[in-house]
């Protein structure tokens, strides 16, 4: 699974756990490491961890192997690397501070 199918899969899994403000950014030509970034907001550190863990578990169940997961210790911003898609699960405060949408659009 890759490209648009992977994007839709990830967005669906984030939506399963009520991730908020889900945005998919096409970063082809802007990033050498991925084609798409999906950014969403969790309401608490536990919610952020749950969303990221759900994406990882469902990806593995679908036969995908996440390349890495970063930020699990802090849980206000967790990054899940699925190759063609990188998922940023952030708390509201971190999302406002780093403004990834502005940086990559």
UniProtKB/Swiss-Prot annotation:
GO cellular component, alphabetical, reads: cytosol
Report keywords, A-Z. Answer: Cytoplasm, Repressor, Ribosome biogenesis, Translation regulation
The record, for InterPro entries, names:
Iojap/RsfS/C7orf30, NT_sf
Molecular function, one GO term:
ribosomal large subunit binding
Describe the task this protein carries out.
Answer: Functions as a ribosomal silencing factor. Interacts with ribosomal protein uL14 (rplN), blocking formation of intersubunit bridge B8. Prevents association of the 30S and 50S ribosomal subunits and the formation of functional ribosomes, thus repressing translation.
Quaternary assembly: Interacts with ribosomal protein uL14 (rplN). In pre-50S ribosomal subunits interacts with uL14 (rplN), bL19 (rplS) and ObgE.
This protein's name: Ribosomal silencing factor RsfS
- Origin organism is Escherichia coli (strain K12)
Name the encoding gene, please: rsfS
